[in-house]
Amino acid sequence: MSGRISDRDIAAIREGARIEDVVGDYVQLRRAGADSLKGLCPFHNEKSPSFHVRPNHGHFHCFGCGEGGDVYAFIQKIEHVSFVEAVELLADRIGHTISYTGAATSVQRDRGSRSRLLAANAAAAAFYAQALQSDEAAPARQYLTERSFDAAAARKFGCGFAPSGWDSLTKHLQRKGFEFEELEAAGLSRQGRHGPMDRFHRRLLWPIRTSAGEVVGFGARRLFDDDAMEAKYVNTPETLLYKKSSVMFGIDLAKRDIAKGHQAVVVEGYTDVMAMHLAGVTTAVASCGTAFGGEHLAMLRRLMMDDSFFRGELIYVFDGDEAGRAAALKAFDGEQKLAGQSFVAVAPDGMDPCDLRLKCGDAALRDLVARRTPLFEFAIRAAIAEMDLDSAEGRVAALRRCVPMVGQIKDPTLRDEYARQLAGWVGWADVAQVIGRVRGEAKRTKHPRLGRLGSTTIARAAQRPTAGPPTELAVRPDPRDPTLWPQREALKSALQYPALAGPVFDALTVEGFTHPEYAAVRAAIDTAGGTSAGLSGAQWLDMVRQQTTSTVTSALISELGVEAIQVDDDKLPRYIAGVLARLQEVWLGRQIAEVKSKLQRMSPIEQGDEYHALFGDLVAMEAYRRSLLEQASGDDLTA
C-alpha cells in the first residue's frame, strides 16, 4: 500500500516553495501592482498577458483560460503529474525530506513515478560524467579538446561517456535501488536478447535538462567507426519525462539571460550551444533530435515575455551551407505565428558556430549574432538569389516568387517597406507597381482588420464628397484616407468641442500630424492658446483662423469646424478620448519603431550598457502604448 504524505509536510513544502519562484522557472513574470505579477499563460496561447500570480496569497489565475490554484496545482498542470508527484518534486526543489506513513519502502512507493525517473536520470548523468575520466573515454575527451572545450566546459555542460559494457549503467543503478522497469521507463535501459542492457554504448553524451535543471534525457554522439549504430547522433526515446518537441539543450543555463535580455539564439547542435555560451552568447539553445517547432517557440516566448505589444528577438543561427539556408527558409514559414522579431545569422564558409569559434575566436561568434539579418530580408533575398536578374524574364520570375512572400507580412507599414526594398533588390524601376502588387496579394490572403475604433467612421467618411475648390486638391488632405483619419478626427474634436479635447489634445506634438495641412491647423490651434483658451463655437473658430495667412489652411479650419463627428452626443466624451489616444498611439508607434531600429543595429554584447538602457526605454514606451491601445479600442468609441 502506498505511503501517505503528512499534512504537515504538505503545508511546509507549500510554504517553502514560493509560487513566484516556481512559476518563474516557466514564465517570465512582470510586476503588475501590489502583490501581483503577470505573464503569458503557459497553458494556452495568448498575445497579451492574462496570467496573474499573487505571491502573498500563494495562488495563480489566468483570466484567459480559467486555470488557477496553488503551487501544487501549477506543477500538476504544467508537468502533467499527480498531486503526490507534485509534492515530491517541490520537496526535492527546496531540500525538504518527506516522512511517509504506512509505506514499506520509498522504492516500493515511488516505483515508476516521475520523481523516480528523474532520480534515475540524475544518477545516470553522474555515472556518465565520472566515466568521461576513464581511459576508455580518451576519444571522447579528445573530441572535446579538439573543439577547444576544456575540463571546466565539460563539467559546465555535464558532458559524459557511455562505457562499452552492455549493462554497465544498468547494473550500477540497480545497485542503487532502481529496478529495471524504472530504467526502461526512463529510456536508460532496454531489454536485449540476453537480458537488460544499456541504451547508450561508447558514445559522448550530453544531459538534456528542463528549464528547472532536471535531467530528462541524453543526446549521444558517435565516436567510433565500428559503432553498430550508424547514426551520428541519437537521443533518449520519448518517455514520461523526455518529449523532443518541448525540450531544448541549454535552456537551463540560458533562461535567465533570455528573460533579462528578451533575446534567444537558436543553434543546431550541442557543441554549438557550448561554443556560444563560452563565447559570451549566453542565450543560446538548441532543439534535440527534431526540428525547432511550435512548442519550442512557445517556451521562448514565455521567457521573453513576448506579446503583441513588446516583441523579443529570436535569432536563428545556421551553418553557411545549403542545408542551413533551407532551414532558414523553413523558419520563415513559422515566423508569422510568432509575435517576436525573427532574425537570421549565417556563419561564413559553411562553418557552424563551433567551427567558427575554433578558427576565429570568441569575438567572431559575438559579431555573428550582432550582424544578424531580419528573417524577412534573408528569406526574400535567398529566393531572389535563385533567379537570373540579368534577364527580363528572370526579374519577372523573381517578383512572382517574392510578392506572395512579402504579402504574408502582417504589419502594413513593414510590408510596404519590404515591397520598396524588393523593387530595388530585383531592379524593378516602377516601385509603385511592386507596392500595389504586394498590397493586392495581402488583401487576397487576409484583408487587414481595422481596429474597432474608426472602422464605421472611415466607411462613412468614404461616402462624403471632398469639399473645396479643385485647385486645392493637390495640397489638402483626402478625408477618405484612413491613415490620416485619427488626425482629422482629433482636429475636428479640438475645433468643435475644445473643452472635451482639453489638455490631452494640447499635449499632442505638431510632429504627430504627418500631413502638412493638418500640422498647420494644429499649429494654429496652439498659437490661438490651445483648447484651454476658454473659447468655443464661432468665436473659437475665428480665433484659430486668425493665426494663419494661408487660404488653404483657413478653409480647412472652417471645414473641420463644421464637419459632423459621426457619434451620438452621449458617447462624445469617450469617443474623443479614444480618438486622441489612437493618435498618441500612432505617434508613439513611430518613435518605438525608431528605437527598435536602433536596437537592431546595436550589439547587446558589445554595447551592453547602452543597449539595455535603450531597451528599458523601449519597454516603458511599449507599456504606455498598450494603455493607449486599450483606451482607443473600447466598444463605445465607434460611431
Swiss-Prot record:
A zinc finger (CHC2-type) spans 41-65. One of its GO terms (molecular function) is zinc ion binding. Binds 1 zinc ion per monomer. GO terms for biological process: DNA replication, synthesis of primer. It comes from the Bacteria. Mg(2+) 1 binds at residues 268, 319. Keywords: DNA replication, DNA-binding, DNA-directed RNA polymerase, Magnesium, Metal-binding, Nucleotidyltransferase, Primosome, Transcription, Transferase, Zinc, Zinc-finger. Contains an N-terminal zinc-binding domain, a central core domain that contains the primase activity, and a C-terminal DnaB-binding domain. Monomer. Interacts with DnaB. Co-immunoprecipitates with DarG in the presence and absence of darT. This is DNA primase. The lineage of its organism: Bacteria, Bacillati, Actinomycetota, Actinomycetes, Mycobacteriales. The gene is dnaG.
